[in-house]
Amino acid sequence: MQRFGLVILFSVLVSLVQARTYVVCAGISNYSGTGNDLRVSAYDAQAIDKIFQKNKYSESVCYTNANATTQNIIDAMDTMFVKADKDDVIMLYFSGHGIPGGMVCYDGFLYYSTIYQVMRKFNVRNKVIFVDACFAGKMRYSNQRDDRRSKENVMLFLSSRSTELSMETPRMTGFHNSLFTVFLERGLRGGADSDRNRTLTADELYTYVHVGVVNASGNRQHPVMWGKFNGNMPVIKW
């Protein structure tokens, strides 16, 4: 019995060591026309992509501006996430404009229902969506009366409540990212790894980013984490 228990423990530890993170990043600063442009969203996506590109346990792809179309993002998720095993992490990061129930790509809307349909195809335990957009909290709602999203095994980490703006950092600060992504990037680089075990969990990331954004914004922006997931879910490891 003792030997059997050791075998199980070893198998679990091996799976954690081998677990990988597969990421699709998208950010749009320059929308079609000029009235809807943002300053830093493309930089946001590139900053998060860079973290995972440099991480030996991760793979990432990034689309910005005119390349961040609805179909390109869907195709990228299909191509990237099919590589994931059951104990890996699949992740979508988006920075740009949002709408209730979805996000605004370069050429149209990408709804959460579509993202969930894509993620549902893959037998992966750990699924993550990061969204940096004004009124991001509204993005988990739609006009559909039969909303099954709360039953999905997906972690949503949104940059602000449904009534709040998601702030861009002032030009004079030297940062080229939004406030949420500044702290998300720092957290993913290791700042949020509170127990220093080189594995960052959902709870650790939420605590770090939420406290940082709330303090830096003067209590005007409050990131929210929502969904059906384990707080000990790994997000990235080093």
Residue ranges and their predicted role:
Residues 2-6, 18-238:
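Cysteine endopeptidase catalytic domains of the caspase/legumain-like
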Residues 10-18:
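Hydrophobic h-region of N-terminal signal peptides that target proteins for export
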